[in-house]
Amino acid sequence: MAETHRDILTEQQQQEMLAKYDKEASYRQNPGKWAWVISFIAISLTIFHLWRAFPQTGGPLVYQIQGAVHLGTALGLIYLLYPFRRTGMKKVGVPWYDVLLAFLSMGSVYYIILRYDWITGAARIVGFTTTDIIVASIGIVLLLEATRRAVGLPIIVIASLGILYGLYGTNIPYFGHGGFNWEGLTRRLFYTSEAIFGTPIQISATYIYLFLFFGVMLTKTGVGQYFNDLAFGATGRFTGGTAKAAVAASALQGTVTGSSVANTVASGSFTIPMMKRAKFRPEFAAAAEASASTGGQIMPPIMGAAAFIMADYVSSVSYSDIVIIGIIPALLYFTSVFMGTHFEAKRHGIHGLPKSELPSMTGLLKQIYLLAPLVTIVTMLVLGFTPTYAALWGIGAAFFVSFFRKHTRMGISDILDALEQGARVALPVIAACATAGIIVGVVVFTGLGGKIAGGLLSLAGDNLFLLMFFTMIACILLGMGLPTTANYVVTASMAAPALISFGVPEVAAHFFVFYFGIVADITPPVCLAAYAGSGIAKANPMKAGVTAFKLAIAGFIIPYVFVYNPALLLQDADITTVILLVITALLGMAAVSATMMNYFIYSFKWYERPLLLLSGLMLIYPENFYIEGGGLLLFILIAGLQYMRKKKVDTQTTTL
């Protein structure tokens, strides 16, 4: 870009803004003499995961032991990096009590490695010792505190309520269970493969960590900035170009990032000031970035790291299948947000940027090799290679690409910094996965999932729409304030069973709860991504949240469409059906988006807006040719009326 505006946030301001709205970034800025210890442990942790990823060097290692190294080391780093309160971020050094907690947390988890044969053998016959239970208790408490520091309070509240339910929920009407004492619940949560060391932490230790490190490597090679430049070069000259570029950039960033708030701050620190300068309202600028960044969590191939866990939860599909299935819904979402920015720009007469302020597309195309790491991963996944192997090749491709430009060439210090940053980025995800395991464990041990499913089915009766509506509300409430991986784990274990019990295909049910858990980040009143964007835009947070909700309305409609018609998820459908469904869905989304933005081809007359909304809903109505046909005719009618009125006004203006 030829110009950097004075309102664009510096790196320090970005970090402060991110820490304000995202607990994951609120770590100590100056650990003092402990800095080298933190670096050594973090670098070692990343090297451990790279070593484990190579089948030739990794060798056999029981997954509980790998998970213990993964989680134990992460907990130690969290206590060394994250202060008790945010006010401790700027204090120099690490307090003695956090050092103590770091060693205690590491020791309690490493205890599993030392006593592995006992825990998996004789202890299950003769019973666990008092020491075993004490260590497990310490480990659980310290895990919860570490998660509070690195992730936030919402997931801790849910996990704590789960533990209390496991202990005291025996007499709750309808939701009662057989009951557990502290010893029984603790050993199940800490020493089995169904809770803390269950699927989420196993996936985190094998796949997620490597893909997060891949994202760090892309940042080091300048791919993130290339995404921004490519988006502005391709869309910046059109009507409302700055907002369209923000949407496109966030879609590209979302392919490799795992946090809507982090994406909002990283991209928004540049795009939001640009949108304001182009005369977009501050609330809209914040909303556009927040809705696009939130959409990044549903963008393949990473999908906020939830895709890996979904592939394990959904028995009928592989990870590469999940990636392919997620493409059409994600494109529909971003197309809808893109159209929303267009309608807003047309309504307020906001034009594109002059050519002098845009990067040269010729120059950008000469740097197309920067996309090689991403293309490498996607290609290998499509060809059927494992995610681990694909991630390794992607990391190698990123390292190779870094040498193409002098300012991105990675020396020893750059490599060490990348290894450390890989661990830092992974810490909140690891803590969230482990704590989500507590929630899953309680659901499994008490049968709570079946009870919730039964309750939702009773409320809905035989009405699928009502069941989806109640499930949507549950997912949004459960997803508020949770990171993407934990968000999906919680909603999948507590909400998806109801849809599956009703007969909804397993893939569609899991995508449904995943989508609604994600859009919680832009659903008032707890819309963290919108709040982060409003902080950059200096806008009213609630107005930004409401506007983001309007822009991202597709995210609230698409899940209903693919439950009623799984062809949108490429399930049991021929190519003709899929193409027709996508076309009608796009037209429907355009109509709904125009209604939300209060502008279509021209300003609405009082009757046109509700009719256009009706046409949009009819166009996305599932598997009914007559209703969809009627919606198309109504859409064409409104578009024709508006076009003729606009043409008449334009002619009169030209004559004058």
Question: Locations of the language-model features?
Answer:
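Conserved, well-structured core domains of diverse proteins
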Residues: M1-V126, I133-S137, K646
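Transmembrane alpha-helix interface/packing and boundary motifs in multi-pass membrane proteins
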Residues: R148, G215-T219, S250-S259, S291-Q297, ...
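Hydrophobic transmembrane alpha-helices that form the pore/transport pathway of multi-pass ion
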Residues: N228-G296, I302, A306, T484-F516, ...
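Long, contiguous bundles of hydrophobic transmembrane helices that form the permeation core
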Residues: A2-W36, I324-V425, L528-L617, K646-L656
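Core transmembrane alpha-helical segments of multi-pass membrane transporters/permeases
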Residues: G107, E145, A150, S160-F175, ...
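Alpha-helical transmembrane segments
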Residues: Q66-G72, Q202-L212, D321-S336, T386-I395, ...
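Membrane-water interface regions at transmembrane-helix termini and the short interhelical loops
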Residues: A53-G58, L81-V92, I119, I138-L153, ...
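Membrane-interfacial loop-to-helix junctions in multi-pass transporters
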Residues: T130-I134, E194-Y207, G233-V247, A278-F284, ...
